[in-house]
Amino acid sequence: MQYIKSNDGIKIAVYDYNLKGKQTVFLIHGWPLSHMIYEYQISLLTNCGFRVAAVDLRGFGKSDTPACGYTYNQMSADIFSIVQRLKLRNFILVGFSMGGAIALRYMNIFKGFGVCKLILLSAAAPCFTQRSDFPYGKTVKEVNSLINLAETDRPQLCLNFSKQLFASPHSDAVIDWFK
């Protein structure tokens, strides 16, 4: 693990595996997770000969937790700082949930700098809430309930979220791992 400073001076934790891999896969996690959500994928990808770069987004994992700067624009700028520092070119960018939205913002703002392929996994994009022209996602009422729970009982919110990550039941130990 290494820290890479973002354009606003925040230390971002970056994990770089199998530096001699044939091609790089860059993994961006979703909320409220860290790069560890990709633990099994990192192992598989490196065993298949890929270099894997993974990030703990600002406020998550071992990255700094600043009071502000949690916009998709800033987080995509963080990704750009990492891409530049690691000298990544011709890499596969993967984003899960909020990480997918950040990956899309990166593609837009930085014109896909260095990216040869984009993989979105259950991306929170193009938007998170339902609209008249976008019937997917959560209703405004559901999002307001999530915000209220985040303000009043964050551990319960994270527990509820962790249970939604799986298509089939898992042990309490696995659920605890996501808290």
Q: What does each of the following model-derived ranges do?
A:
Residues 104-152:
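Flexible "cap/lid" loop of the alpha/beta hydrolase fold
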Residues 24, 51, 89-92, 114-117:
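Structural signature of beta-strand start/N-cap positions in the alpha/beta core
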